[in-house]
Amino acid sequence: AGQGYGMNWKGDRGFLFEGALTTPSAITTLKFEIGVSDADDDAGAVNGKAAASATAGDFAVFVFDTDDDTNLAFISAKGGTVVATQDIDAVTIATSTTYRFAIRVEDDNVTAWVNGTKVGAAHLIEGGTAVTPWAFARARTGSANREAVWNKWRMIEPAFQ
Protein backbone atom coordinates (compact mmCIF):
# COMPACT_ATOMS: atom_id res chain seq x y z
CA ALA A 1 0.00 0.00 0.00
CA GLY A 2 0.99 3.61 -0.34
CA GLN A 3 1.80 6.01 2.45
CA GLY A 4 -0.57 8.74 3.60
CA TYR A 5 -0.84 10.92 6.69
CA GLY A 6 -4.53 11.51 7.33
CA MET A 7 -7.51 13.11 5.65
CA ASN A 8 -6.92 16.62 6.99
CA TRP A 9 -7.05 18.90 3.94
CA LYS A 10 -9.82 20.00 1.56
CA GLY A 11 -9.68 21.95 -1.67
CA ASP A 12 -12.61 24.08 -0.50
CA ARG A 13 -10.25 25.52 2.13
CA GLY A 14 -7.34 25.62 -0.34
CA PHE A 15 -3.97 23.98 0.21
CA LEU A 16 -0.51 23.51 -1.21
CA PHE A 17 1.22 20.12 -1.30
CA GLU A 18 4.99 19.94 -1.71
CA GLY A 19 7.06 16.78 -1.81
CA ALA A 20 10.53 15.61 -2.77
CA LEU A 21 11.13 12.10 -4.09
CA THR A 22 14.41 10.42 -5.08
CA THR A 23 14.25 7.71 -7.72
CA PRO A 24 16.04 4.37 -7.20
CA SER A 25 19.28 3.38 -8.95
CA ALA A 26 17.23 1.42 -11.51
CA ILE A 27 13.96 2.75 -12.89
CA THR A 28 13.05 -0.03 -15.29
CA THR A 29 9.88 -1.87 -14.23
CA LEU A 30 8.99 0.88 -11.74
CA LYS A 31 5.78 2.66 -10.82
CA PHE A 32 5.63 5.60 -8.45
CA GLU A 33 2.99 8.15 -7.50
CA ILE A 34 3.30 11.32 -5.44
CA GLY A 35 0.60 13.89 -4.70
CA VAL A 36 -2.70 13.93 -2.78
CA SER A 37 -5.39 11.26 -2.49
CA ASP A 38 -8.61 10.54 -0.61
CA ALA A 39 -7.30 7.12 0.47
CA ASP A 40 -4.17 6.24 2.40
CA ASP A 41 -4.21 2.48 1.97
CA ASP A 42 -4.63 1.87 -1.78
CA ALA A 43 -2.16 -0.13 -3.82
CA GLY A 44 -1.78 3.00 -5.93
CA ALA A 45 -4.34 5.73 -6.60
CA VAL A 46 -3.94 5.02 -10.33
CA ASN A 47 -4.46 1.45 -11.58
CA GLY A 48 -3.16 2.06 -15.06
CA LYS A 49 -1.69 5.19 -16.55
CA ALA A 50 -2.49 4.38 -20.19
CA ALA A 51 -6.18 3.65 -19.59
CA ALA A 52 -6.37 6.19 -16.74
CA SER A 53 -8.25 3.90 -14.38
CA ALA A 54 -8.13 4.51 -10.64
CA THR A 55 -8.69 2.99 -7.21
CA ALA A 56 -8.96 6.34 -5.39
CA GLY A 57 -12.00 8.57 -5.86
CA ASP A 58 -10.52 12.05 -5.56
CA PHE A 59 -6.83 12.58 -6.17
CA ALA A 60 -4.18 14.58 -7.99
CA VAL A 61 -0.91 12.69 -8.44
CA PHE A 62 2.21 12.58 -10.53
CA VAL A 63 2.66 9.07 -11.95
CA PHE A 64 5.64 7.33 -13.52
CA ASP A 65 4.85 3.81 -14.74
CA THR A 66 7.11 1.87 -17.09
CA ASP A 67 4.27 -0.57 -17.83
CA ASP A 68 2.89 2.30 -19.94
CA ASP A 69 5.88 4.39 -21.05
CA THR A 70 8.81 6.32 -19.61
CA ASN A 71 6.96 9.65 -19.32
CA LEU A 72 5.96 11.33 -16.10
CA ALA A 73 2.23 12.13 -16.09
CA PHE A 74 -0.11 14.21 -13.95
CA ILE A 75 -3.50 12.57 -13.36
CA SER A 76 -6.49 13.73 -11.32
CA ALA A 77 -9.95 12.42 -10.53
CA LYS A 78 -13.13 14.00 -9.22
CA GLY A 79 -15.85 11.91 -7.62
CA GLY A 80 -14.38 8.64 -8.90
CA THR A 81 -14.03 9.77 -12.51
CA VAL A 82 -10.60 10.43 -13.98
CA VAL A 83 -10.95 13.92 -15.42
CA ALA A 84 -7.48 14.72 -16.67
CA THR A 85 -4.33 12.95 -17.76
CA GLN A 86 -1.35 14.90 -18.98
CA ASP A 87 2.09 13.61 -20.00
CA ILE A 88 4.80 15.98 -18.84
CA ASP A 89 7.28 16.26 -21.70
CA ALA A 90 9.42 18.87 -19.92
CA VAL A 91 10.59 16.35 -17.29
CA THR A 92 12.65 13.23 -17.97
CA ILE A 93 12.81 10.76 -15.09
CA ALA A 94 16.35 9.52 -14.43
CA THR A 95 17.95 7.15 -11.92
CA SER A 96 19.05 8.31 -8.45
CA THR A 97 17.63 11.79 -8.99
CA THR A 98 15.63 13.96 -6.60
CA TYR A 99 12.54 15.70 -7.98
CA ARG A 100 10.48 18.41 -6.28
CA PHE A 101 6.72 18.23 -6.81
CA ALA A 102 4.02 20.75 -5.90
CA ILE A 103 0.23 20.71 -6.25
CA ARG A 104 -1.99 23.71 -5.47
CA VAL A 105 -5.69 23.00 -4.93
CA GLU A 106 -8.26 25.79 -4.72
CA ASP A 107 -11.85 24.58 -4.53
CA ASP A 108 -12.02 21.93 -7.31
CA ASN A 109 -9.14 23.39 -9.36
CA VAL A 110 -5.65 21.88 -9.43
CA THR A 111 -2.31 23.25 -10.66
CA ALA A 112 0.93 21.23 -10.73
CA TRP A 113 4.67 21.99 -10.73
CA VAL A 114 7.84 19.87 -11.05
CA ASN A 115 11.18 21.36 -10.00
CA GLY A 116 9.61 24.82 -9.92
CA THR A 117 8.15 24.66 -13.45
CA LYS A 118 4.37 24.78 -13.91
CA VAL A 119 3.45 21.61 -15.80
CA GLY A 120 -0.32 21.28 -15.50
CA ALA A 121 -3.54 23.13 -14.78
CA ALA A 122 -7.30 22.84 -15.23
CA HIS A 123 -7.33 19.45 -13.54
CA LEU A 124 -10.08 18.78 -11.00
CA ILE A 125 -10.73 17.05 -7.70
CA GLU A 126 -13.79 17.30 -5.44
CA GLY A 127 -12.91 20.27 -3.23
CA GLY A 128 -15.20 19.11 -0.41
CA THR A 129 -13.50 15.72 -0.06
CA ALA A 130 -10.74 15.39 2.54
CA VAL A 131 -7.36 14.28 1.16
CA THR A 132 -3.92 13.31 2.45
CA PRO A 133 -0.38 13.66 1.15
CA TRP A 134 0.29 10.49 -0.85
CA ALA A 135 3.28 8.48 -2.03
CA PHE A 136 3.39 5.01 -3.55
CA ALA A 137 6.11 2.99 -5.27
CA ARG A 138 6.41 -0.58 -6.44
CA ALA A 139 8.39 -2.83 -8.69
CA ARG A 140 6.44 -4.21 -11.61
CA THR A 141 5.86 -7.98 -11.90
CA GLY A 142 8.98 -10.06 -12.31
CA SER A 143 11.42 -7.29 -11.45
CA ALA A 144 13.88 -6.72 -8.65
CA ASN A 145 12.94 -4.60 -5.65
CA ARG A 146 12.51 -0.88 -6.33
CA GLU A 147 12.54 1.73 -3.57
CA ALA A 148 11.82 5.39 -4.21
CA VAL A 149 12.71 7.64 -1.28
CA TRP A 150 10.08 10.15 -0.12
CA ASN A 151 12.53 12.72 1.26
CA LYS A 152 10.17 15.38 2.48
CA TRP A 153 6.61 16.60 2.21
CA ARG A 154 4.38 19.30 3.58
CA MET A 155 0.81 20.47 3.24
CA ILE A 156 -0.14 24.02 4.11
CA GLU A 157 -3.40 25.90 3.91
CA PRO A 158 -4.18 29.59 4.36
CA ALA A 159 -4.50 30.82 7.94
CA PHE A 160 -7.61 32.75 6.91
CA GLN A 161 -10.81 31.93 5.06
Regions found by a protein language model. Give the residues of each.
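Secretory/extracellular carbohydrate-interaction modules
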Residues: 1-72
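Short tryptophan-centered beta-strand motifs in secreted/extracellular beta-sheet-rich domains
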Residues: 17-19, 97-106, 110-112
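Beta-strand elements of well-folded, non-transmembrane domains
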Residues: 21-25, 105-107, 157
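Beta-strand-rich, repetitive solenoid scaffolds
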Residues: 33-37, 60-65, 74-77, 102-104, ...
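Short, aromatic/His-centered strand-loop micro-motif at the edge of beta-sheets
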Residues: 77-100
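Short, solvent-exposed beta-strand-to-loop segments that form ligand-recognition rims
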Residues: 88-89, 114-133
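Ligand-recognition surfaces built from glycine- and aromatic
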Residues: 126-161
